[in-house]
């Protein structure tokens, strides 16, 4: 593999051309099985919205450390929201060379999930004096979720299921996590902005600025660059989709090395199962191509809810926060 497939998902947004829907779903299914990564165009997110988000993100990371620390993750409690400093996240057991802002579906205290004390559910933390950040994030998140829902329709059809199979099941109330990551300039070839990992949930929809650094590990073990392609999103399959499909869809390892000499921004949306859902494999044949995972883990042998799986993962990313924020859930 030298380049990822490029897929226009417009037909899955409008759902008004049966032949185009079938073709698009088939292409998504093939890309998910062969690569686990692909570019998405026709996603419905306007260029102007990307520009607003990029400008607001730069403005946030230009704030002083003291200003950003006012909304540090330690203040986010079980919601797991807020800012973390450079080196504050350990994706694969060593500090990543990035800082970031953890966000998600903005839920008030009256939401049943928040009232029940569910981790990773709650209110976002926003900096004072930067209202454009909240506006840009909320508008972008709404558009990106619509694109994710369209992709999930395509995934269902590719698997021979009804288009609304997931929307009426494990993503009826999805876990929505959104991040803004800032990679400073000055990295070198072996300086990992994000260490090798796979994503935990169903789908990741990644927006990125013009400075590359993302790499995906191909099935043959080689690393393939995933450079920006205009405002196309990069979509990848997560662990739970690999589990659901009995290995048919591939949750591919990936990493970030920012060796561009310039700062880099990215905006991943993690579109994941309902926190309380049991992610049981679909009644389809298991692939004969089950490969050893990069981390030695076994998503196919996992048990419990998606929340159980997710908490077990995020507690390793922020070990110092895990005990305080996750409490009895950790």
Residue ranges and their predicted role:
Residues 1-330:
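Peripheral, non-catalytic segments flanking oxidoreductase cores
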